[in-house]
């Protein structure tokens, strides 16, 4: 087993809750999900984000299987990627994040493109970010980011251009090649979940195109994520 394979194996075991013993007294992930929902409601009431009218609730039936409950009240069995501890939850990824949309830059900014990501360390190369005026802004320079936003490149996702916005000393704008995820989840947990081979494989399966395969926001948002009690 190569070092990269070992790293991937350890990461996957962590995402399945198999690295450390699970404490039944830990707060269940359902409580974290409630706090996320409350925060989204707050942002909706403040007019900062829009309500998702097609929100899907996922629950575990008495038979141990997972089901999706849709806005119209109907339910459907859902295939989950793997088993997780009882205190964890499977949710659609759109349920755990929000973003503040897009805007055409009105003042000078630092531009985060996919080439701005150091893929070996999965960090943003802040020193190499272009400083651009509004007139110099590329057409893709539109995504608003916040402190601890997680960036996931939807173009050629197998390259794993994924990072967390750790510094917000200047006005930053990200490329529309990224999905920007703002959340109450631990941003490091989310980053590593998005980096896991299992998740990337699911993204690749939903991507279209040959030279530059990409996944659209709709299909990305329907992907499942395992919500840990301490995530």
Model-derived regions, located:
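Sequence-specific dsDNA recognition surfaces
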Residues: 73-79, 94-104, 115-147, 165, ...
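Conserved structured core elements
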Residues: 4, 82, 87-90, 139-142, ...
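Non-catalytic DNA-recognition/assembly elements of restriction-modification systems
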Residues: 6-9, 13, 18, 75-106, ...
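Active-site-proximal structural scaffolding
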Residues: 3-4, 8, 12, 86-90, ...
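Extended, domain-scale alpha-helical bundle/helix-rich regions
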Residues: 6-75
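Short helix-capping and inter-helix turn/linker motifs at the boundaries of alpha-helical repeat units
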Residues: 1, 70, 211-215
């Amino acid at each position: 087993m190569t070092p990269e394979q070992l790293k991937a194996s350890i990461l996957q075991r962590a995402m399945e809750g198999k690295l450390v013993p699970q404490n039944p007294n830990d707060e269940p992930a359902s409580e974290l999900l409630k706090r996320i929902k409350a925060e989204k409601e707050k942002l909706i009431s403040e007019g900062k984000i829009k309500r998702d009218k097609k929100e899907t609730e996922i629950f575990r039936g008495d038979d141990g299987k997972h089901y999706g409950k849709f806005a119209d009240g109907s339910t459907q069995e859902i295939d989950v990627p793997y088993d997780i501890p009882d205190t964890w939850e499977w949710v659609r990824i759109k349920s755990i994040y929000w973003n503040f949309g897009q805007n055409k830059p009105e003042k000078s900014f630092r531009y985060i493109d996919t080439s701005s990501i150091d893929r070996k360390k999965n960090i943003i190369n802040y020193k190499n970010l272009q400083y651009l005026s509004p007139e110099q802004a590329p057409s893709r320079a539109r995504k608003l980011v916040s402190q601890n936003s997680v960036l996931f490149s939807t173009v050629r996702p197998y390259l794993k251009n994924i990072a967390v916005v750790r510094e917000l000393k200047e006005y930053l704008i990200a490329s529309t090649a990224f999905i920007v995820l703002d959340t109450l989840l631990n941003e490091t947990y989310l980053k590593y979940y998005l980096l896991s081979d299992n998740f990337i494989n699911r993204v690749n399966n939903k991507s279209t195109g040959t030279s530059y395969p990409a996944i659209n926001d709709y299909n990305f948002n329907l992907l499942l994520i395992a919500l840990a009690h301490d995530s």
